[in-house]
């Protein structure tokens, strides 16, 4: 990260650096606390390390918060007061933006829905809860199920392609994924009641295979009076959302 920043031609003109990093983390101190998908990154003072080497102010926040910020300002959430962004990728993360400001929580853990318990069964993990949303409805979860049940060696996209071609096992895995993700989204809706849920992350490359069913499943899981107002849309900024949001962090932190 340091070498890449120093190689940028515009580095000398920069006034600050924003970093979107996997949570959990301490956004106030810029410390990475032990993300499930970054083994060994325990209590890493990323802000201090970067500031010492780059000699510019550095702001660190959850990568999902950064993406949420970008989508709320420039993407699918633009024009809405409250936007909850969910990334479904290697893991599952979330960020809540209200009135264009990220809601971080007392310990920088607001929106950490990946560790939300969906069921009391499921694989174990050294950091995450058993039966958590991330272990059941992430790209990694799909990849794991594809490998265990179909001996697939590719990513989640391969599983979606098999399901579209009628493979019954692949279809069952995707159906389970949709059910778990729908429960997680319904829990978010009942907790913060956002204007819109925005879905991003690598799994959304296969959105055409599951978005319609996902919307219907979510409606089945919420209060009847909420069903007509459920709004779930794919992210518009794609993989750039986190980068755009990270660039916005220093200004947002003033």
Q: What do these predicted ranges mean?
A:
Residues 66:
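Short, glycine/acidic-enriched loop or turn micro-motifs at the edges of active sites
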Residues 84-86:
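Conserved beta-strand elements of the Class I
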Residues 93-97:
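Short beta-strand scaffold segments in enzyme catalytic cores
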Residues 109-113:
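Structural signature of FAD isoalloxazine-binding scaffolds in flavoprotein oxidoreductases
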Residues 30-41:
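A charged helix-plus-loop insertion that forms the helical arch/lid used to bind
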Residues 63, 89, 246:
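Active-site glycine-centered loops adjacent to acidic/histidine catalytic or metal-binding residues
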Residues 1-17, 25-31, 47-58, 70-81, ...:
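ATP-binding/phosphotransfer module of carbohydrate and carboxylate kinases, centering on a glycine-rich
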